[in-house]
């Protein structure tokens, strides 16, 4: 019989309301079932969700719904990473308070997320800008301070003189602020730091336990922590070139084996010797200032032209005092790594080689590959930085690099310069303590008070929270807290004298470093309920972009350890499983070229295929526009698709199904209208097949078949159930989709037969069993459609509360097996035969194979060994 088309605009809000009324997704901490905590990285409330959000949250929702059906007590919360600069920028540009802008955006985005039908526990929702959240963050800060995990020191920072704020190294581009474009200044400011370096070795070692994390992320963190074993080497300054009072330069190196290849030393622009030289030389002063203005991120250092300036200082080689080397100030040496000084071995380091070629410094090969020829080995345009055998290194020649390392380390450790060893073995880490001070209003206030008499005084916990004042103005750059007439003035908690509040706020990465813990008991009057936190942590499955591989994920690992040290949690790691999904990308379209190029939105064009080539035209004018590359969706290039438009046109289930179906979840998915329409056709087809057969199916109870014409129906359904269950366990969503398509195709004819009134009761019962399995398989991805189909079959209760089906082992076994056939130990053929075939049947079938007949060439086999359902061996 004909049925109405599935109408998502009617069905989706209706089922969302029922889930909400029934509180299906609210989690009870006292539920005794095994727990499963699934969490997607919570969003910044920018105002609108984008298709990347849809994909991220759809993946998490599949996991949550699937695990809930499998009988777990699932925690699947949502909140808002709500502090940060965009809100202050909006305040300056639009004259709206950051809080108003933020909470309006949260309301809009929450409505969008609810329209997606996500199985979220909204009762645990919070925003990090809620006073009730950040007061607990202030409590944690004070606990860390008491434990010695927080300290304050003078630190050089990148200062944007237009925005009047500190910039991270990554925010300095070609010496200018990323937002204002102003030339960045280097300033000494007193900053607050978290002692993440206390856990350097533990953070590194524990990476080996994170076997459910992508190897790429673990490697990125390993490199960021940057443990190295090396040597500090003290180089004597040639007295007649030494600045007053200076006698040596200390260098940290991981390659002391290459010392005989040294041709220069390089120091950072902020090294004490560089500062001394700059004070006496205008040219050096200007060069040091140029170095400071350049970006100090790794990317900036690697791509910038290598520059240096000879200081005139000379040092004596530690292994040969008669050998003098020049000391340069170089733009690629940083004061906050090692000692702020390096020795350059051009033959063994590409950066040093480029530098040496530029300034005419010697290049002496000192390491060659183990199969190299010392007489002919040379260095051209590429340095050799591998392991190998020492050459041109005097007493080290012929040694391996490892042997040479130890020989040099032992020799310099035994040698003296002044009254101390000239060399000392050392373990170094690239990881630096986390500076959390930000000169901004819209962040968590740091709960300390500055008193002229008492110094730095922590705010007593009984006086928390330190609330942000609401009566602030953004009519000028800088931190409004600095110029607030009353908020910063406060009595000292110790002596009662006039004092000042700290006006810096915390880095917003602090907010996201423990939110997953707060979700376990967001109503608790303390930062955590240890019992709840210890029950739920670590998060079983965390989902988010790989762009957070370093900072957020590393800071969260530190925070969990710091909270362990202060008694708030027992867990050591925050996230047991990590999945980094790919982006949603789209073609770009543009008109014009160069500076006059104008990007065009996908909604404003139509695509035609003319003479076998895809071409794009403006809807408004039929003007042809250029089809560009496929790139990450971005507002700047207008290649964005609004989820609201897709949901309004096709429904949330179609959007969810498409972003899960078109490519492996760890890869980018290319957005295409054809793909979305294909997903929509699937939802309509599934509804039509189920709804047309619903009256007949609802009259019988589901029961799989064990024989007869319905057996193939039951086998197809139960085999698919087993396979998709494995796919969901491994987050292979696209594979699950492919199998579901196959099952729909397999069930189309049986469902059509039942709809036409054909088939006996056993056949209809088997088809109903298969149809219910199909509905339950699609439910995690298309939950509204699944509920509609489930109800159409006459099932009472919500599918969202229904247990996952179990496959019948007898139905998933293959009837045939493929046996390899070996003759005298060599595989010669394969035999496909019934799983139940006895030994005689297998033997006769093997001897009848052409490949076996040819191999035997008329000979009778001495022995045939049949290992049931495994292998056949023939001995000739």
Curated annotation (Swiss-Prot):
Sorted UniProt keywords: Aminoacyl-tRNA synthetase, ATP-binding, Cytoplasm, Ligase, Nucleotide-binding, Protein biosynthesis
UniProt cross-references to PROSITE patterns, sorted A to Z: AA_TRNA_LIGASE_I (PS00178)
GO molecular function: aminoacyl-tRNA deacylase activity; ATP binding; leucine-tRNA ligase activity
Keyword RNA-binding tagged: no
Motif 'HIGH' region, residue range(s) on this chain: 43-53
Gene3D superfamilies in the record: 2.20.28.290, 3.10.20.590, HUPs, Isoleucyl-tRNA Synthetase, Domain 1, Valyl/Leucyl/Isoleucyl-tRNA synthetase, editing domain
Catalysed reactions, as listed in the record: tRNA(Leu) + L-leucine + ATP = L-leucyl-tRNA(Leu) + AMP + diphosphate
Compartments it resides in: Cytoplasm
First-listed, main subcellular location of the protein, grouped into a coarse class: cytoplasm
Residue window of motif 'KMSKS' region: 632-636
GO biological process: leucyl-tRNA aminoacylation
Positions of ATP binding: 635
GO cellular component: cytosol
CDD domains assigned: Anticodon_Ia_Leu_BEm, LeuRS_core
Enzyme Commission code(s) on record: 6.1.1.4
UniProt family annotation: Belongs to the class-I aminoacyl-tRNA synthetase family.
Protein name as it appears in the record: Leucine--tRNA ligase
Organism: Rhizobium etli (strain ATCC 51251 / DSM 11541 / JCM 21823 / NBRC 15573 / CFN 42)
Lineage: Bacteria, Pseudomonadati, Pseudomonadota, Alphaproteobacteria, Hyphomicrobiales
């Amino acid at each position: 019989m004909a049925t109405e088309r599935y109408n998502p605009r009617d069905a989706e809000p209706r089922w969302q309301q029922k889930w909400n009324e029934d509180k299906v997704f609210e989690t009870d901490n006292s539920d005794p079932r095994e727990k499963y905590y699934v969490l997607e990285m919570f969003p910044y409330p920018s105002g609108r969700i984008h298709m990347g959000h849809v994909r991220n949250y759809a993946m998490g929702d599949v996991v949550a719904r699937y695990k809930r059906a499998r009988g777990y007590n699932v925690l699947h919360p949502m909140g808002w990473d709500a502090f940060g600069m965009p809100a202050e920028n909006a305040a300056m540009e639009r004259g709206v308070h950051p809080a108003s802008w933020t909470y309006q955006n949260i309301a809009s985005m929450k409505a969008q997320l609810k329209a997606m039908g996500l199985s979220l526990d909204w009762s645990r929702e919070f925003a990090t800008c809620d006073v009730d959240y950040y007061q607990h963050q202030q409590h944690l800060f004070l606990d860390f301070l008491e434990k010695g995990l927080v300290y304050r020191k003078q630190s050089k920072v990148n200062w944007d003189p237009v925005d009047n704020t500190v910039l991270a190294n990554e925010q300095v581009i070609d010496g200018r602020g990323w937002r204002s474009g102003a030339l960045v200044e280097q300033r000494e400011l007193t900053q607050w730091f978290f002692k993440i370096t206390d856990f350097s070795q533990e953070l590194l070692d524990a990476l080996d336990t994170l076997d459910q994390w992508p190897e790429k992320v673990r490697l990125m963190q390993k490199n960021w922590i940057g443990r190295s074993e090396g040597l500090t080497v003290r180089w004597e300054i040639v007295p007649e070139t030494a600045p007053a009072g200076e006698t040596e330069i200390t260098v940290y190196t991981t390659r002391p084996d290459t010392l005989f290849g040294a041709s220069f030393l390089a120091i950072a622009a902020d090294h004490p010797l560089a500062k001394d030289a700059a004070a006496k030389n205008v040219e050096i002063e200007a060069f040091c200032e140029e170095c400071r203005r350049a970006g100090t991120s790794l990317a900036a250092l690697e791509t910038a032209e290598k520059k240096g300036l000879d200081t005139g200082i000379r040092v004596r080689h530690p292994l040969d005092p008669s050998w003098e080397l020049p000391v340069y100030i170089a733009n690629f040496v940083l004061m906050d790594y090692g000692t702020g000084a390096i020795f350059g071995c051009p033959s063994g380091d590409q950066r040093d080689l480029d530098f040496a070629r530029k300034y005419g410094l010697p290049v002496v090969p000192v390491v060659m590959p183990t199969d190299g020829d010392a007489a002919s080995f040379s260095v051209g345009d590429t340095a050799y930085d591998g392991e190998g055998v020492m050459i041109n290194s005097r007493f080290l020649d012929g040694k391996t690099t490892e042997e040479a390392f130890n020989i040099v380390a032992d020799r310099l450790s035994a040698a003296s310069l002044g009254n101390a060893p000239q060399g000392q073995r050392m373990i170094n880490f690239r990881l630096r303590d986390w500076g959390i001070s930000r000169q901004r209003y819209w962040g968590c206030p740091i709960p300390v008070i500055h008193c002229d008499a008492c110094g730095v005084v922590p705010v007593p916990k009984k006086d928390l929270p330190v609330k942000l004042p609401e009566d602030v103005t953004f009519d000028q750059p800088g931190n409004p807290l600095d110029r607030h007439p009353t908020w910063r003035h406060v009595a000292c908690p110790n002596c009662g004298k006039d004092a000042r509040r700290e006006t810096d706020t915390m880095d917003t990465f602090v907010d996201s470093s423990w939110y997953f813990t707060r979700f376990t008991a967001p109503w608790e009057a303390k930062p955590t309920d240890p019992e709840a936190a210890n029950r739920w942590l670590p998060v079983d499955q965390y989902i988010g972009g790989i762009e957070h591989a370093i900072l957020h994920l590393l800071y969260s690992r530190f925070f969990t350890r710091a909270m362990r040290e202060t008694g708030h949690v027992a867990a050591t790691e925050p996230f047991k499983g990590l999945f980094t999904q790919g982006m949603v990308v789209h073609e770009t379209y543009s008109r014009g070229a160069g500076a006059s190029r104008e990007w065009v939105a996908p909604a404003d064009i139509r695509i035609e295929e003319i003479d076998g080539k895809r071409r794009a035209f403006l809807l408004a004018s039929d003007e042809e526009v250029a089809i560009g590359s496929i790139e990450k969706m971005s507002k700047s290039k207008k290649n964005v698709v609004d989820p609201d438009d897709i949901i309004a046109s096709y429904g949330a289930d179609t959007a969810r199904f498409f972003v899960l179906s078109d490519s492996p979840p760890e890869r980018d998915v290319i957005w295409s209208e054809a793909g979305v329409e294909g997903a929509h056709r699937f939802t309509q087809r599934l509804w039509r097949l189920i709804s047309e057969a619903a009256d007949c199916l609802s009259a019988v109870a589901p029961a799989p078949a064990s024989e007869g014409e319905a057996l193939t129906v039951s086998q197809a359904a139960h085999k698919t159930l087993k396979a998709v269950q494995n796919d969901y366990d491994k987050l292979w969503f696209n594979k699950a989709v492919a199998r579901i398509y196959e099952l729909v195709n397999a069930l189309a004819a049986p469902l059509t037969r039942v709809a036409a009134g054909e088939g006996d009761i056993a056949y209809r019962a088997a088809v109903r069993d298969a149809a219910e399995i199909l509905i339950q398989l699609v439910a995690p991805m298309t939950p509204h459609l699944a509920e509609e189909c489930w109800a159409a079959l006459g099932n009472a209760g919500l599918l969202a509360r229904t247990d996952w089906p179990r496959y019948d082992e007898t139905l998933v076994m293959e009837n045939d097996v493929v046996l390899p056939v070996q003759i005298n130990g060599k595989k010669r053929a394969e035999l496909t035969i019934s799983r139940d075939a006895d030994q005689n049947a297998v033997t006769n079938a093997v001897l009848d194979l052409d490949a076996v007949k040819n191999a035997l060439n008329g000979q009778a086999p001495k022995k045939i060994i049949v290992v049931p359902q495994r292998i056949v061996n023939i001995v000739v």
